């Protein structure tokens, strides 16, 4: 099994849709790569960070995936002296020797008085040393995970405190980012069961921050009203959040979220779980072993640094699509996805890095990884309009989308049954207007017994794209 298959097996008893599980895995890989691995030249690097929002009704298993992703991201500590054999996980990573700094920190944490005595013998003044908060301070994470709900000020402060450094193997070469053999950067990932906790009203600064940090610029500078100037070096932010269609529609309709965020985020929309399950059993030894393999791979990824390249076949695949195929299909794309498609070349390359490094530590991306990334995004695009389609002013458009989702989820219904479901949202004359539009655009049709059936196709572009790319 490859690592994605191991992740699926690890979560095999979760009812979450496959797309949630898969994108949760790729988000985890992007978080592990942080701001260290990049495509393109060092002057205009493209990093693997992603903003991913799992959209669906309550009970689909969004939180299940996000919770397990967060547990994996939080496992490795910055100064990690554990093995993977603690408590529930079988042995996987051997313990290593502590550095002198780590030994001193451990002594100060566990026995402050002995630490003071040792420091005194070394001639250090310990009279003003305070250890009252040291025991309560959590060990820093190797991959920093930001707070669930935060103000802009707390966000920038958290990032400023999340500086990570590595000593990359340069093999006698130089790099403009590496100073005195060390590369430092500020990184954080948001794993939010409810993305609304971050995107509340009056959080315009947070939204603007996510817009500007998506490209992982060398410097992030923002002048606050009362706190002076915030400057964060080499920032990198990843986001995985859960949301409902209702919140997404309200957020876009009220301009709480705008096109800027919609073009940078990938929305994974589903309307039903993989299956229904009364209770989730304990993890088996085989599942736990798969979890260990993934944790080991994540640890390896945190040591990578440098420029990533494509094989000639992989580069030609993307070049042909975006220079020759994409301009021809662009006029037929849904209006709601125009902004997102403007950045599709960025989305697919970020995802291609996540797909490639999901199993490899080699710095060359191959054609299969590029093809897989393209296929994943094509599949997600078929439903993405459900999340970003509410940017207009017509409230009946939202009703039309919800009627389509109802017919897809529960099967054909009569007009009377639909009116019963939506009587609190529309009057009869408005419902007839919506149904007339759905008929005229071929999105629904009548079948036996005057029942209405959804005709929404999976993706009209997919077959055409695949034919052109062969």
Locations of the language-model features?
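Phosphate-handling catalytic cores of nucleic-acid transaction enzymes
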Residues: 1-470
